[in-house]
């Protein structure tokens, strides 16, 4: 008996199925099915994952989708060929795009005119009141391509429905087919299916009634059960349909957009012309010979692989951005390409790193290249809309990201669906830290008096939470991956509306795109590019010599001296706790040191035990030894320690005689060596190749283990070098133009590790004067005060802008600035009338103390604002008089509290300065006093919790940053202490820490022994930390 399952929903019919696509494919293969149709509801979101699994298992896969039409029809459409697939994908796109996100609207007329080649299975059901006209329309429209689907799931009246369908089939001359009805791969998933139904319906499971599946018969069934459920003729019809279907996703062929090539030339000729033009700009004195050879090699491979259109497409996007003065820079493996450098896609010159094109493109890999380009985060939307305008919404769309269940969301949704007490569920979810794993949930449950081992309800709850983890919840948009095609995108993959206006996304994520070999252009957002442009614009107003990244002086000793002290708050890529600790140890002195600095504080080098040997060799403590000149040529820049991915590739090439493509395949195998055994087939070749070249066996094994240790996580040198350019630029600006630098960071928030308050604290430590928000002095953004600046030193005063005020709209702020013009406001009433402000606007300004120069103090501002009548056009131009109101100014404590609540910071006293005289803070050392404590001595400190980090490389160690009135205090919390002081760690705003002080390589931190939460003393302060995984 041969059987094809025709109605199968995966968990990409979000919250309607309890099985992953792979699970359904695997189960169908085990059960001996001839073929399986994946028919997610108005979606192809799960089809690629099913396709990959089916290919591995040699199971025939049918591509289809299930729809509920507006007239009540329930149908399945299956694509028998490539044209039918394009129709189906387009039909899904139409239905999705005419409805709001997550919904769809499909009409019978759409079906008739848009699915000319698809096979249709009509699924009549109980109480399905379909007009005879519609039935006749369906039967007439699809003639030999229509079946009536029958599903037997052992429910009441099923036999009566079957008799009715028999009569209907005879009357219409339409065959019946056993369509099956599958929402899970086996019956054990029924509890999960029920809980998913409750989540979808937003109703506790106890109240769902008939909305629940009445039994567990909606699974993939063994062939002998199917034989008992369906007449043989109905099962045979499944094979008729399967035999009509010859389409595979492997038939999809991506077509690059072609309009960028002039009609009188070829793609490669046009690309060569642009590269030649770029060469002249990059090397005005003539292209170096070695660069010419690399360019010729790259262009030859690009032509052979037919990637010309891809490079032209990315070049066009970058050219648009540069024409609009939008800073952008390519990164990642693309920086290994000299062609990309000549096209101004990347900024790393061949001389700055040892470029390796195989890391970017190789024949053996036979995959489209991947070029990631960062754009200013505040202006990236201009680039996105340019792409939409140039190619149209039919030919350009963003990739999807699948939002899946994580611990907290799983606990909340499962708990609510089970009808558990809402307060308990909320507390349990909040008690989980981001670093907790599934096993930690048991501990948290036990801390609330819940025992999953003895309490059946909790046992069920825990089991369901575990099962739902990783389940897809809904589609969201990718951070910037664009699919751009010559024809309609919907011929390849369905489109749907994103939650953001003027955005469309495809139904596949980046893994699906990679599996199908589609071109993706990553248009990414980077806050530092925004900050750099704004910094340079400010600097150019008083220093004409510095106006772009290219004009920043190179290899500046003062900049490297600043970094070597760990003074890197706000600096790109080296502002984390780990990087700030590494800087004084590595002490960078040149650009390449920054390339290493950025790459070495990563999981790969740390897990590969490469950091300490490198530092010892750098300090001259450990001798550098190379096996021979070939090894030296690869490892000399990093003192014999492999740090970069490119070095792993080169070592395989020079030591084990791998080709460039083979070496890159080795790197990719290393990236997934923990997930599959693909690395094993390379190990023998690597070891044998080294033995053949005369290397000792122990050295070969040691080298392979070393590069294996970082292969999955190590940074590409090209990527690190791209980031090092921005790191150096931001460092130089911080060192020489601190006011412009910090002002730009404030105007580019949110970005980076630090809040506006922390940045301002650091700015003041660098002798920058920061002025509070004030309606007559402030623009919308913060700005550097240039008035009367006539010294050789850069200006050092920042005036905070109206954008700092929480809740004040951009339009209101711009009205204030426009109304002020060259004539400052003299009274509150004048401000209200000229800027057409509402009472709410005035109260926001008063709360931020932005009116203090008009009213005297914050209390006066609030009273006067409250007393003002709403703006009336009748009063425009009227004489304005008002009685002065004089109330006592708020206390310093109240002012600081209100500052934080309205702007997130205070320029008055630091909150710790207010508390310093009180117990127990009067016994705490300030950050500025820690130098007086000997190494290993006891230390007691307190401060605002401004950051929590728990990197995966730190073996569970948590790093806290506390801020007091004199600076930042670094706290290290071992795992044993974390559990003991868990609640304080998770929620404290104000923390007191007792521990042991450690100082090494000019880095001081405190190993926490005890921690105490004193947040209640700042309960009215709106203070938040920035927490990073």
Curated annotation (Swiss-Prot):
The gene is dnaE2. It is found in: Cytoplasm. Belongs to the DNA polymerase type-C family. DnaE2 subfamily. Gene3D superfamilies: 1.10.150.870, Metal-dependent hydrolases (3.20.20.140). GO terms for cellular component: cytoplasm. It comes from the Bacteria. CDD domains: DnaE_OBF, PHP_PolIIIA_DnaE2. The keyword DNA damage applies. It comes from Saccharophagus degradans (strain 2-40 / ATCC 43961 / DSM 17024). Keywords: Cytoplasm, DNA damage, DNA repair, DNA replication, DNA-directed DNA polymerase, Nucleotidyltransferase, Transferase. It is an enzyme of class 2 (transferase). SUPFAM superfamilies: PHP domain-like. HAMAP family: DNApol_error_prone (MF_01902). Its EC number is 2.7.7.7. It catalyses: DNA(n) + a 2'-deoxyribonucleoside 5'-triphosphate = DNA(n+1) + diphosphate. One of its GO terms (molecular function) is nucleic acid binding. GO terms for biological process: DNA repair; DNA replication. DNA polymerase involved in damage-induced mutagenesis and translesion synthesis (TLS). It is not the major replicative DNA polymerase. InterPro entries: DNA_pol3_alpha_NTPase_dom, DNA_pol3_finger, DnaE2, DnaE2/DnaE/PolC, DNAPol_HHH, NA-bd_OB_tRNA, PHP_dom, Pol/His_phosphatase_N. The keyword Metal-binding does not apply. This is Error-prone DNA polymerase.
């Amino acid at each position: 008996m041969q059987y094809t399952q025709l109605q199968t929903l995966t968990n990409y019919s979000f919250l309607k199925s309890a099985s992953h696509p792979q699970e359904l494919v695997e189960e169908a293969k085990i059960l001996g099915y001839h073929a399986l149709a994946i028919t997610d509801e108005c979606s192809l979101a799960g089809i690629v994952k099913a396709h990959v699994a089916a290919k591995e298992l040699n199971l025939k896969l049918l591509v289809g989708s299930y729809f509920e039409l507006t007239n009540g029809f329930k149908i399945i459409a299956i694509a028998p060929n490539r044209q039918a697939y394009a129709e189906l994908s387009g039909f899904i796109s139409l239905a999705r795009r005419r409805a709001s996100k997550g919904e769809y609207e499909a009409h019978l007329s759409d079906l008739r005119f848009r699915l000319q080649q698809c096979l249709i299975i009509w699924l009549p059901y109980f109480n399905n009141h379909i007009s005879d006209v519609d039935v006749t329309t369906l039967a007439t429209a699809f003639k030999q391509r229509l079946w009536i689907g029958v599903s037997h799931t052992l429910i009441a009246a099923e036999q009566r429905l079957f008799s009715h369908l028999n009569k209907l089939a005879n009357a219409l001359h339409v065959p019946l087919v056993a369509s099956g009805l599958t929402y899970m791969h086996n019956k054990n998933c029924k509890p999960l299916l029920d809980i998913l139904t409750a989540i979808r319906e937003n109703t506790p499971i106890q109240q769902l009634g008939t909305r629940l599946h009445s039994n567990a018969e909606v699974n993939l069934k063994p062939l002998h059960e199917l034989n008992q459920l369906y007449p043989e003729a109905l099962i045979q019809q499944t094979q008729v349909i399967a035999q009509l279907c010859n389409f595979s996703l492997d038939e999809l062929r991506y077509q690059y957009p072609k309009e960028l090539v002039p009609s009188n030339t070829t793609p490669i000729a046009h690309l060569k012309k642009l590269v030649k033009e770029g060469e002249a700009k990059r090397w005005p004195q003539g292209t170096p010979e070695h660069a010419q050879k690399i360019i010729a090699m790259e262009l030859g491979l690009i032509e052979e692989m037919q990637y010309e259109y891809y490079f032209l497409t990315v070049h066009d996007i970058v050219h648009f951005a540069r024409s609009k003065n939008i800073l952008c820079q390519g990164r990642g493996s693309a920086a290994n390409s000299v062609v990309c450098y000549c096209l101004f896609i990347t900024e790393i010159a061949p001389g700055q790193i040892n470029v390796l094109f195989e890391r970017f493109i190789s024949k053996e890999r036979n995959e489209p290249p991947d070029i990631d380009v960062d754009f200013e985060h505040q202006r990236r939307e201009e680039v996105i809309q340019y792409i939409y305008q140039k190619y149209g919404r039919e030919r350009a769309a963003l990739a999807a990201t699948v939002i899946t269940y994580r611990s907290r969301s799983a606990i909340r949704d499962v708990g609510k669906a089970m009808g558990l007490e809402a307060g308990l569920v909320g507390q349990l979810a909040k008690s989980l830290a981001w670093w907790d794993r599934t096993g930690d949930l048991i501990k948290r449950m036990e801390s609330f008096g819940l025992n999953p081992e003895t309490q059946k309800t909790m046992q069920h709850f825990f089991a369901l939470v575990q099962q739902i983890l990783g389940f897809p919840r809904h589609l969201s948009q990718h951070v910037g991956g664009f699919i751009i095609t010559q024809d309609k995108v919907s011929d390849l993959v369905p489109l749907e509306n994103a939650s953001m206006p003027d955005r469309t996304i495809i139904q596949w994520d980046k893994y699906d795109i990679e599996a199908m070999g589609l071109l993706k252009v990553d248009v990414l957002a980077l806050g530092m590019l925004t900050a750099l442009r704004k910094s340079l614009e400010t600097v150019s107003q008083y220093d004409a010599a510095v106006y772009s990244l290219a004009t920043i002086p190179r290899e500046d000793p003062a900049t490297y001296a600043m970094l070597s002290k760990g003074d890197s708050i706000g600096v790109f890529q080296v502002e984390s706790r780990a990087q700030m600790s590494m800087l004084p140890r590595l002490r960078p002195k040149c650009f390449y040191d920054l390339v290493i600095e950025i790459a070495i504080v990563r999981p790969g080098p740390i897990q590969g035990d490469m950091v300490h040997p490198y530092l010892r060799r750098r300090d001259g403590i450990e001798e550098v030894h190379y096996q021979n000149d070939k090894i030296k040529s690869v490892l000399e820049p990093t003192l014999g320690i492999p740090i970069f991915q490119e070095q792993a590739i080169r070592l395989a090439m020079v030591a084990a005689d791998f080709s460039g493509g083979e070496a890159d395949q080795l790197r990719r195998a290393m990236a997934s060596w923990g997930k599959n055994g693909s690395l094993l087939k390379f190990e023998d070749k690597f070891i044998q190749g080294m033995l053949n070249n005369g290397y000792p066996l122990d050295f070969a094994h040691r080298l392979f283990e070393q590069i294996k240790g970082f292969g999955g996580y190590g940074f590409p040198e090209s990527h690190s070098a791209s980031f090092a350019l921005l790191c150096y630029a931001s460092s130089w600006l911080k060192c020489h133009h601190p006011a412009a630098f910090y002002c730009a960071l404030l105007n580019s928030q949110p970005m980076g590790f630090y809040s506006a308050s922390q940045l301002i604290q650091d700015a003041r430590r660098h002798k920058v004067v920061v002025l509070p928000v004030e309606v007559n002095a402030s623009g919308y953004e913060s700005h550097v005060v240039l008035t009367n600046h006539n010294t050789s030193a850069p200006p050092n005063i920042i005036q905070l802008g109206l954008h700092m005020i929480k809740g004040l709209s951009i339009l209101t702020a711009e009205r204030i600035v426009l109304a002020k013009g060259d004539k400052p406001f003299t009274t509150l009433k004048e401000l209200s009338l000229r800027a057409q402000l509402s009472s709410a606007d005035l109260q926001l300004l008063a709360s931020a103390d932005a009116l203090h120069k008009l009213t005297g103090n914050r209390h006066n501002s609030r009273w006067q604002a409250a007393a003002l009548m709403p703006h009336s056009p009748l009063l425009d131009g009227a004489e304005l008089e008002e009685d002065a109101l004089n109330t006592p100014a708020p206390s310093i404590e109240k002012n600081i509290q209100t500052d934080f609540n309205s702007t997130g910071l205070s320029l008055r006293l630091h909150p710790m300065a207010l508390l310093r005289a009180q117990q127990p803070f009067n016994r705490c050392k300030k950050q500025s006093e820690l130098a007086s404590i000997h190494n290993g001595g006891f230390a007691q400190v307190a401060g605002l919790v401004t950051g929590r980090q728990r990197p995966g490389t730190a073996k569970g160690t948590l790093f806290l940053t506390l801020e007091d009135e004199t600076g930042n205090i670094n706290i290290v919390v071992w795992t044993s202490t974390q559990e003991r002081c868990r609640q304080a760690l998770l929620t404290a705003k104000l923390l007191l820490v007792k521990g042991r002080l450690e100082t090494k390589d000019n880095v001081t931190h405190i190993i926490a022994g005890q921690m105490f939460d004193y947040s209640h003393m700042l309960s009215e302060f709106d203070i938040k930390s920035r927490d990073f995984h």
